[in-house]
């Protein structure tokens, strides 16, 4: 894993302000309902990058579909049967450069740059198996040592931080504490949410019996300083148990009375890790 050079000092990311990233655990990228919903998401939200997880197919099965949407597979970690899979899809006329830093079974790390400005993005699909998820936590902790430019992580963490992030099920303090310790070691904070509190739902007889906040966006101080107006929006849930997330790097065009983006007034690391 090579060292990622640093931009000094941390600057506002001019040229990245309009960047939009959709992140979604799609639970089957070949399903017709899922494909219709993705097409509508791209039409209405106009993302530049689409991160998909739990793919349940090979990219070759849907390559023509994505080409018709104007996206290409920048980085792909294929699913093994119905298990795993991460796709980083980028708009064809993106206008920014990308470089793969590291491919991991539960994470794809890549760099985006324009002119002399760059930052790192991680697409995360944490395993639902705690022992496998621990491998990811160790990987991210090691990765932190090689990254010295702004760092954003987006995806399905398959873990919660607080009791308030679970409704209808058990909160497991030991696992939440381990997740919080990883964020602390990696110097990451939660970027907050607009539009709700939960991203994953389990239904029984069309009644929601369990809700959790498994998906989130995390950034380090450098990333937040570079994107002070950035916000994270929960989108409508269709087809999957997970709601998509939309990261507005430059902030939403129209403010609402919903939660404002996190501001640094700042920073006790342990307190921030536990702050929603």
Regions found by a protein language model. Give the residues of each.
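Surface polyanion/phosphate-binding segment centered on an Asp-His-Pro turn
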Residues: 210-212, 216-217, 221-276
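Conserved acidic residues
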Residues: 48, 156, 215
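Active site of divalent-metal-dependent phosphoester/diester hydrolases
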Residues: 75-88, 186-217
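Short, P/G- and charge-enriched loop/turn segments at secondary-structure junctions
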Residues: 73-77, 96-98, 202-206, 232-235
């Amino acid at each position: 894993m090579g060292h990622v050079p640093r931009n000094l000092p941390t600057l506002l990311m001019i040229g990245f302000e309009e960047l939009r990233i959709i992140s979604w655990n799609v639970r089957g990228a070949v399903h017709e309902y899922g494909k219709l919903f993705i097409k509508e998401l791209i039409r209405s939200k106009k993302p530049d990058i689409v991160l998909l997880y739990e793919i349940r197919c090979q990219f070759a099965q849907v390559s023509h579909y994505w080409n018709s949407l104007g996206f290409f597979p920048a980085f792909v970690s294929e699913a093994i049967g119905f298990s795993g899979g991460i796709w980083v899809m980028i708009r064809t006329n993106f206008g920014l450069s990308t470089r793969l830093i590291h491919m991991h079974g539960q994470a794809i790390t890549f760099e985006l740059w324009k002119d002399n400005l760059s930052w790192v993005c991680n697409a995360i699909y944490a395993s639902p198996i705690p022992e496998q998820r621990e491998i990811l936590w160790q990987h991210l902790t090691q990765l932190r040592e090689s990254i010295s430019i702004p760092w954003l992580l987006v995806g399905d963490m398959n873990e919660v931080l607080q009791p308030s992030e679970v409704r209808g099920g058990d909160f497991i303090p030991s696992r939440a504490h381990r997740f919080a310790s990883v964020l602390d070691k990696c110097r990451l904070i939660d970027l907050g949410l607009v539009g709700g509190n939960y991203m994953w739902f389990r239904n029984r007889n069309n009644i929601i019996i369990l809700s959790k906040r498994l998906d989130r966006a995390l950034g380090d101080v450098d990333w937040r300083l570079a994107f002070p107006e950035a916000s994270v929006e929960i989108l409508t849930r269709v087809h999957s148990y997970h709601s998509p997330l939309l990261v507005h790097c430059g902030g939403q065009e129209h403010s609402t009375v919903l939660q404002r983006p996190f501001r640094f007034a700042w920073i006790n690391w342990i307190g921030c890790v536990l702050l929603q």
